[in-house]
A protein has these predicted regions:
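N-terminal strand-loop element at the rim of the active site
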Residues: 1-55, 219
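Acidic anion/phosphate-binding donor-loop and adjacent secondary structure
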Residues: 53-55, 134-138, 146, 151-173
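Short His-centered aromatic/hydrophobic patch
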Residues: 75-82, 100
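Conserved donor-binding/catalytic core segment of Leloir-type glycosyltransferases
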Residues: 171-187, 193-196, 211
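Aromatic "clamp/platform" in nucleotide-sugar-dependent glycosyltransferases that forms part
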Residues: 243, 262
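Short hydrophobic beta-strand element within catalytic cores of glycosyltransferases
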Residues: 279-282, 292
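Conserved acidic donor-binding segment of nucleotide-sugar-dependent glycosyltransferases
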Residues: 294-295, 299-306, 315-320
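A short, well-ordered alpha-helix in the C-terminal region of glycosyltransferases
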Residues: 308, 315, 322-337, 343-349
């Protein structure tokens, strides 16, 4: 179960405490059955509404909304969010919220039309980072006051490092560098592999292992990364974990976190790495610059810059004291800024609900 799913579960829990009922709608059934079970166990409800057309989706959402005394509708990650919001308007739903999780691109006239129309019919447009908010407002022609930043959050945790190293059979005598990402090129896993090539073959640094957590939504993307790994002759330095539900455990076993994304709204994995008290090397894109304080909780680098990434990894590999120092600051920073319960409570204010 990912960080966002845990955020929704906490939202459901808080709503139930206030006497409200959360219905989570999907266009396809979620892969993680634990997520569905956890939602149901705390009074939530899951509905699968396949998307066939905007008109069909509008009718389906309108029918669902009219079955309940619906006070708010909130769309996430949804290409069909526009029709859902229109259905809410037709049923006079008071609070209509959309959340932008990625760094929006409003470089074309068409994209500006789409975002402006969506913002027009919402009562609030939430962005998960200030960088996303700024990008959105720069492309809007009206309604900029509706756009606000609401950070996501992660639940605090603690796992014994030695126990986690043993549990996942990680090398005791090597620095473990974690990366949590799908294998989409936007996440920059290929950049990480090329930086490993520099570390091993140019800098002669070999006392480390990359722990890559995630998978390919498209198998061809994963195959391309494995081919690159073979071409660079770095297979001995990469451990491919795949998609798992126990990311915090693995992060607790590692020493450094690396997020070389080409674009990013904000990274829940960086928040979790910080709670594991390890420093992050991240690119200066989107919300990463808000979750990593350069020189304090980690190191920021330019995107696509494999040399900077290799240099930053070398710097932290060679300094245990700095890793520990940055990790402690990172943990405190995450607990203050990205606390799950308080950030969910902030979200509920946009539904007209005050805890």
């Amino acid at each position: 179960m990912g960080g966002f799913e845990k955020f929704i579960i906490e939202e459901c829990r808080q709503l139930k405490l206030m006497g409200y009922h959360l219905i989570v709608c999907f266009s396809v059934k979620p892969i993680c059955q634990d997520y569905i079970n956890d939602l149901k166990s705390i009074g939530g409800e899951c509905r699968v509404i396949p998307f066939k057309s905007h008109f069909q989706h509008y009718l389906a959402m309108r029918k669902l909304i009219k079955q309940y005394h619906t006070i708010a509708i909130h769309t996430n990650f949804s290409s069909c969010g526009f029709s859902a919001i229109l259905a809410a308007i037709s049923c006079r739903v008071k609070y209509r919220i959309a959340t932008q999780h990625c760094l929006p691109s409003l470089n074309t006239f068409k994209s500006r039309i789409i975002y402006n129309m969506e913002n027009l019919i919402c009562t609030k447009y939430l962005c998960v980072s200030q960088a996303s908010t700024d990008a959105m407002c720069n492309g809007l022609w009206w309604g900029k006051r509706k756009v606000v930043t609401e950070y996501l959050g992660v639940e605090d945790f603690f796992y014994d490092k030695r126990e986690m190293i043993s549990k996942y059979a990680l090398p005791v005598d090597k620095i473990k560098i974690a990366n949590v990402a799908y294998h989409n090129p936007i996440k920059g896993v290929d950049v990480l592999l090329k930086a490993v090539d520099i570390l091993v073959h140019k800098k002669q640094i070999v006392n480390f292992q990359i722990v890559q957590i995630g998978g390919g939504q498209n198998p061809e993307q994963t195959d391309a990364l494995h081919q690159l790994e073979t071409q660079l002759h770095i297979s001995n330095y990469i451990r491919w974990i795949g998609v798992i539900d126990t990311v915090p455990e693995l992060l607790s076993a590692c020493d450094i976190y690396c997020q070389p994304s080409r674009s990013e709204g904000i990274s829940l994995s960086i928040m979790e790495a910080s709670l594991a008290n390890i420093p992050t090397i991240g690119t200066r894109v989107g919300g990463i610059v808000e979750s990593v304080r350069d020189g304090a909780t980690g190191i920021l680098i330019d995107k696509e810059n494999t040399q900077q990434l290799a240099d930053a990894m070398e710097y932290l590999i060679n300094s245990k004291s700095l890793r520990i120092q940055m990790g402690k600051v990172a943990g405190n920073h995450a607990r203050q800024k990205f606390q799950l319960r308080s950030n969910v409570t902030n979200l509920l204010h946009h539904y007209g609900i005050n805890m």
